[in-house]
Design a protein with these regions (language model features):
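Residue-level marker of intrinsically disordered, low-complexity segments enriched
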Residues: 1, 18, 34-37, 74
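Secondary-structure boundary elements
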Residues: 1-4, 23, 32
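Compositionally biased, intrinsically disordered low-complexity regions
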Residues: 9, 20, 48, 52-54, ...
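Amphipathic, interaction-prone secondary-structure segments
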Residues: 25-69
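Intrinsically disordered, low-complexity regulatory segments enriched in Ser/Thr/Pro
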Residues: 58-92
């Protein structure tokens, strides 16, 4: 499993709250057990909430997960990686993103692309 934490807010991110953080080992284990092979993310945790984005690959499909949450649940609790919501390539994913969303995942996208994912 490839895991990459960008470790900072994306340059053009409009919502910057909390402190940059990492996924917990238990959260990584849950994602691994879901069959995810690649995880690229940035995440920030505040007092009672968190924000972030995850670009991940499962069963040869790319997914975007919004890691934002309140104190009622954590950053991966509501993850939905349905095959109907995935993209067969990074190119297809980029074409489907709004400009605003792409700004928040651009460093993750660029790293995945650099790692020779398609």
């Amino acid at each position: 499993m490839k895991i990459y934490n960008y470790g900072k807010f994306p340059k053009d991110c409009t919502y910057k709250y909390g402190n940059i953080a990492s996924l917990e080992d238990s959260e990584i284990e849950i994602l691994k057990n879901m069959g995810i092979s690649n995880i690229y993310y940035w995440y920030a945790s505040g007092n009672f909430e968190g924000s972030g984005k995850m670009l991940c690959k499962k069963d040869n499909l790319w997914h975007i997960h919004d890691m934002s949450h309140c104190s009622c649940y954590d950053c991966i609790e509501n993850i939905n990686l349905s095959p109907y919501g995935g993209y067969s390539s990074l190119k297809e994913l980029k074409l489907k993103c709004t400009d605003e969303l792409f700004k928040e995942i651009e460093p993750l996208f660029n790293k995945a692309k650099k790692d020779k994912h398609k």
